[in-house]
């Protein structure tokens, strides 16, 4: 099942997509927030099989119940990978961070990101696992023998430009980064509504494209 980029789906189609993603979560033994509560967000990243570090070719999907408790699905174009300029010059001596696909429960909160301290989802509440790519080329290396765990600031944020950006370049050092500022702002609006209802704590699940087959 394919989703268009930066789209909102409601009604029967949203219910079908919800079932499709929740089945994938169930196969991985991950939790899904499917109770009858509005704005209880399922935030799911999908890493493209191409593993292209140069492009925003991954997907972030948010599945939740709206005001009328009907299911809504929103999707956004992102990268789940570090950009090529960071891969060439890692900021950590162990190598560049690449988030390991998993479900990370209650690990992010709304908080400041980066030098400009704008508001994003910040990894402040729990540890994550990352692959360490230390060969300083632009090919993504996801070696299970080189996994690091800790607080690495793997945030969910936008890139620095105000316009939609085509290439990642240095926009991601392992964070989950939106291609579109408009999409990011839409996503953060949902997060603020959810935080008012459930508290400032967010679960993020990163899947691989093959997990949905």
At which residue positions do the language-model features occur?
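Cell wall/extracellular polymer interaction/catalysis modules
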Residues: 1-169, 183-192, 198-202, 209-211
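Residues immediately within or flanking Cys/His clusters that coordinate Zn2+
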Residues: 172
